[in-house]
């Protein structure tokens, strides 16, 4: 049960009770750390973004929460279908090729997020809902601003009943969502990506047909480019019998279409769904829109110059948001949460200096969101999306190099020693990851696997095109298509499980992923 009174002091204060805040606070509490979590609203609360990635199951397993998610009978998600080029068959990502036990769920976020928050309470986190952080106090600061010499030491709060108070802390985790109190109010270092300044309109439907119902792909979400190539739509079946259907486009496109089209958000939403024939086929004659369910949300893509500072970490949407495409939000949130907890503990235990811990966290967040950013940009290029351009300013060069150094010989060439990120290099990497969306069948995959063996393993080396040509017959187009797709999937192979924290070194350190010993160790 939630605690009754906000204490005057704690070791770690967490702002925000979404997946990032709940997960980070749970990790720390299970390590014996005193944690207080302040959440502005009362759970359950509505939230869009129902489609999860395979890593979700493994993150939950680490905190002993996986079985509760299974018990809730959330919709099984075996993979995802993408229709980015009309006139061609859809591309399907089968999570089984990622390895055993890599399926996940489509969840009702209000229920799923509350499960995580209540689990945090059961692990010893002191949780106070409907309690908003109004301001943060810093040490060594005349005007209460962030400087290299200052660190956050206390937070002023106000709850729903009007009570106010102040809590001091040794460490701060900002998981306040898009509000991002540290980034936007104090550090002022949030950077928006103009090319992905998107908005979404979404609603809920009943009696919608399930994609390939009854087959191995049954219940997979469907993502589709609009026929005018000015946006895309999602369709995600949920376990409560409803289906989440949304449409995403650039803010400028949305403004223009609203001005030119039917008035009102609901009519705009319904009119844009007519540009998604695959969605219309699944809605069919039986599907019905739930009146009044349509909502709109800004899905602006952003990042920051840093995600940490002296005794604080920023995670989840408070740190960065890539794009609703590919459902990376909760994965990035939990990755950031594990990074925050591990680096705080590493600093506490003297395993690394606080400066080293900050650098590790900054790099981990940057690498994770940069990988998904490149996949998103590749998808928009595959859609030939009107008005969307990959801009060099949208990508942090150091994060790009850390995320894709393994792939540099593939997209740049073995003998290119340039160290600066260029538009050409960015474009080449986007082209490389476009192979993710090459339509291949399960039959093709199995047949190619029999012919090439371990070459198809996701854990194997990245193979340049000339190397593929050496081991494949020149006319073996199926094998080339499958292996090029597997090559591209390797971009995300370290984002399928928290176990990658133990093997993917950042600045010479990895995470000791054992309960009771969580922290950083030399690689």
From Swiss-Prot:
GO terms for molecular function: FAD binding; flavin-dependent halogenase activity; monooxygenase activity. Keywords: FAD, Flavoprotein, Monooxygenase, Oxidoreductase. InterPro entries: FAD-bd (IPR002938), FAD/NAD-bd_sf (IPR036188), Flavin-dep_Halogenase_NPB (IPR050816). Its EC number is 1.14.19.-. The keyword Flavoprotein applies. It holds the Pfam family FAD_binding_3. Melleolide sesquiterpene aryl esters are cytotoxic secondary products with anti-cancer potential. Armillaridin shows therapeutic and radiosensitizing effects on human esophageal cancer cells. Armillaridin induces autophagy-associated cell death in human chronic myelogenous leukemia as well as of hepatocellular carcinoma cells. Armillaridin can also inhibit the differentiation and activation of human macrophages and thus might have potential to be developed as a biological response modifier for inflammatory diseases. Gene3D superfamilies: FAD/NAD(P)-binding domain. It catalyses: melleolide F + FADH2 + chloride + O2 = 6'-chloromelleolide F + FAD + 2 H2O + H(+). Chloride binds at residues 328-329. One of its GO terms (biological process) is secondary metabolite biosynthetic process. Belongs to the flavin-dependent halogenase family. Armillaria species are both devastating forest pathogens and some of the largest and oldest terrestrial organisms on Earth. They forage for hosts and achieve immense colony sizes via rhizomorphs, root-like multicellular structures of clonal dispersal. This is Flavin-dependent halogenase armH5. It comes from Armillaria mellea (Honey mushroom). The lineage of its organism: Eukaryota, Fungi, Dikarya, Basidiomycota, Agaricomycotina. The gene is armH5.
